[in-house]
């Protein structure tokens, strides 16, 4: 069973939650504090008459019903667009946080790649030579012991 997250890992999560929550709280406070603007939320209403909900038996209920359904879908579209425009600051903040988090991840991965590349270039002792021969200089370390060719140790320098 895993224990609680260490503080070093918990801090970025708390920061992310604070960044996501702050614009939403600020927008809800601004909406409740701001007085309603005249004409901003005013929608043209269809004239009262026979519609799908209050059709009278005296006439063309089908014609009025068709006009009412197209108008209600238009109202739904206007309502959806106005709600998106109202929450624009929250959406903008969420996109900025997502982009910043993605940039942070890319930077971490690049740092990890460059650090691992430095580790691969360290001097390897007693290893198989995989570098092409024209880029390698080899000199025997034990020059005085030439009778046994199989046990010669070489000093390798890469160009």
From Swiss-Prot:
The chain crosses the membrane at residues 91-111. InterPro entries: FAM174-like (IPR009565). GO terms for biological process: Golgi organization. It is found in: Cell membrane; Golgi apparatus. It is a single-pass type I membrane protein. Residues 112-159 are cytoplasmic. It comes from the Eukaryota. Keywords: Cell membrane, Glycoprotein, Golgi apparatus, Membrane, Signal, Transmembrane, Transmembrane helix. Residues 1-27 form the signal peptide. Residues 52-69 have a biased composition (Gly residues). Residues 28-90 are extracellular. Residues 28-73 are annotated as: Disordered. Belongs to the FAM174 family. Essential for Golgi structural integrity. This is Membrane protein FAM174B. The gene is FAM174B.
